[in-house]
């Protein structure tokens, strides 16, 4: 009985497959991570490391996820905001307020976790796509390599030791602790790595002003413009290769750089290359 039942199962699947009625599981594409560039800064606002320090509960049982942003050159702690989760809808307003207050950095350096990045091509996420629209380079450190953001991690250890052991009684009280720590860290505490100076003595606001309205991308005349569909695909000749649903409705640029090889560009960011013969996309960082 078992063998007959199994044979019947195979026959049914063969029939469904023959008539294209059988949904096959698609293997999820994994993208190689080429690693982050070394950090070299000689003035403020070239690179801002950012991260979520590990979550914890305040005394009333509410979760707190501290979002932190520093300036690599001066070591200044630009923001430390306790949030109830790591959702983009909560993190993006913190970055927007910071950009409005002090301007834009050249680059933001993070790990590969939410909401900063995803497992898709170029780690595209709603947050880093917004950064690209603002002309900010997103540097993603190598997975499981926190030492590539080591300076920021050392600040986190001090933050944890001085503000969360034990945690405050409520999120509001915890935020007050964060603000006290930030003032001391920036204004009172000399740092050996910057010649025993304080971060606030070296840091200055950025000259790059946050634009309230983001201009659409403008590509050179030789670049072919394609709009990403709601399904995350774009047109290449008669084909519709998949790119990313994060970019749905956005205009990308296709630049032919070889025999049937095209660069895929979004604003000034090279997302990858596609071979028009195989439709295989090779990602970049």
What kind of feature is each model-predicted range?
Residues 1-49, 55, 114, 125-128, ...:
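Basic, flexible linker segments flanking DNA-binding modules
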Residues 120, 126-211, 253, 258:
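Charged alpha-helix within mobile-element recombinases
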Residues 6, 103-104:
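Short loop/turn motifs at secondary-structure junctions
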Residues 186-285:
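C-terminal, beta-rich DNA-binding module of retroviral/retroelements integrases
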Residues 12, 16, 51, 69, ...:
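Mobile genetic element proteins and their domesticated derivatives, centered on retroelements
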């Amino acid at each position: 009985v078992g063998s007959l039942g199994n044979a019947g199962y195979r026959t049914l699947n063969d029939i469904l497959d023959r008539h294209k009625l059988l949904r096959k599981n698609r293997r999820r594409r994994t993208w190689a991570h080429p690693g982050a560039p070394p950090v070299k800064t000689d003035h403020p606002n070239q690179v801002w490391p950012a991260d979520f320090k590990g979550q914890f509960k305040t005394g009333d049982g509410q979760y707190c996820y501290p979002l932190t942003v520093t300036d690599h050159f001066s070591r200044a702690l630009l923001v430390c905001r306790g949030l109830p989760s790591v959702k983009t809808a909560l993190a993006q307003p913190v970055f927007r307020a910071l950009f409005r207050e002090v301007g834009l950095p050249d680059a933001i350096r993070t790990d590969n976790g939410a909401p900063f990045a995803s497992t898709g091509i170029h780690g595209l996420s709603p947050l880093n796509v917004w950064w690209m629209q603002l002309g900010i380079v997103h540097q993603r450190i190598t997975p499981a390599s926190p030492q590539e953001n080591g300076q920021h991690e050392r600040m986190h250890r001090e933050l944890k030791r001085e503000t969360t052991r034990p945690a405050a009684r409520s999120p509001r009280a915890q935020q007050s602790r964060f603000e006290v720590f930030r003032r001391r860290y920036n204004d009172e505490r000399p740092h050996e790595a910057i010649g025993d100076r304080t971060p606030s003595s070296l840091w200055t606001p950025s000259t790059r002003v946050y634009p309230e309205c983001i201009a659409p991308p403008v590509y050179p005349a030789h670049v072919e413009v394609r709009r990403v569909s709601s399904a995350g695909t774009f047109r290449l000749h008669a084909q519709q290769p998949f790119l990313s649903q994060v970019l749905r409705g956005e205009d990308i640029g296709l630049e032919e750089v070889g025999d049937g090889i095209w660069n895929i560009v979004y604003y000034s960011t090279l997302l990858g290359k596609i071979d028009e013969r195989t439709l295989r996309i090779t990602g970049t960082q």
